[in-house]
Design a protein with these regions (language model features):
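Hydrophobic transmembrane alpha-helices and their helix-loop junctions in integral membrane proteins
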Residues: 13-169
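Short, small-residue-biased leader/transition segments that mark boundaries at the very start
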Residues: 1, 5-12
Length: 169
């Protein structure tokens, strides 16, 4: 059971993001120019829609695992409860927010067309994260589990707002 959580938390997001980074890297110079890891340089190149349809979901899920996107949120409560309190607070306050930042800065920034077309799928998943995290936090007795599930709910709300793709959200 712990091995499955470790896979979701460690190997899955890293693998998905690595595949996308390499795919974008090798497509960053379609005319034979210099390839780059600079996100501003890559953003100047139009990634083909077929590639965006593959890369956007992989990138969003990869970073979404860090942001406790449903159904990949299961690592978070166990991580919070087994960690020392200070680490648990850093985990909730920093690590999980990096998932949302990665979704925004990489997935949506580099692949906005696919983000507009496919966002409804992830809006459903983030809505489930918000509701499931909130109701799970309500029924918990352990403070660390309350923090963990409320963080799942909060990060779901952050990802939901990012997927709205407007300044108000």
């Amino acid at each position: 059971h712990r091995d499955l959580h470790s896979f979701h938390h460690d190997a899955l997001p890293i693998s998905l993001i690595l595949v996308v980074i390499l795919g974008i890297y090798f497509n960053s110079a379609p005319d034979g120019g210099q390839i780059s890891f600079n996100i501003l340089e890559i953003s100047k190149i139009k990634i083909p829609m077929q590639a965006q349809y593959i890369f956007f979901p992989l990138t969003f899920v990869g970073f979404g695992v860090l942001g406790a996107l449903f159904p990949f949120h299961t690592w978070s409560p166990d991580g919070h409860s087994s960690a020392p309190t200070a680490v648990s607070m850093l985990h909730a306050g920093v690590l999980m927010k990096l998932g949302g930042y990665g979704c925004f800065r990489v997935a949506i920034f580099l692949m906005p067309e696919a983000a507009h077309e496919l966002s409804w799928i992830f809006i459903i998943l983030t809505t489930i994260s918000v509701v499931y995290g909130a109701f799970s936090a309500i029924v918990q007795k352990d403070l660390k589990y309350i923090n963990a599930y409320s963080s799942v709910s909060h990060c779901g709300l952050v990802l939901f707002a990012i997927l709205m793709m407007n300044q108000t959200a």
